[in-house]
Amino acid sequence: DSSEEKFLRRLRRFDEGRYGPYQPFVPPPLYPQPYQPYQPQY
């Protein structure tokens, strides 16, 4: 299991808990996410 997969899974789980499962895993641009180690290029 790569660290990127863990990161994406953690972020997806975070989004489902906060916004609901319908929300894309990319956080909304209302506020920054400074704790992210990097910004995925999508």
Curated annotation (Swiss-Prot):
Modified residues (Phosphoserine): 2-3
Annotated keywords: Biomineralization, Phosphoprotein, Secreted
Disulfide cysteine pairs (residue numbers): none
GO terms classed as biological process: biomineral tissue development; defense response to bacterium; regulation of bone mineralization
Localization, UniProt: Secreted
Top-level taxonomic group: Eukaryota
Residues covered by region (Hydrophobic): 18-42
Tissue expression summary: Secreted by parotid and submandibular glands.
CC terms in the record's Gene Ontology section: extracellular region
GO molecular function, one term: hydroxyapatite binding
UniProt KW Protease keyword: no
Function: Salivary protein that stabilizes saliva supersaturated with calcium salts by inhibiting the precipitation of calcium phosphate salts. It also modulates hydroxyapatite crystal formation on the tooth surface.
Record family assignment: Belongs to the histatin/statherin family.
Name by which UniProt lists this protein: Statherin
Organism: Macaca arctoides (Stump-tailed macaque)
Gene that encodes it: STATH
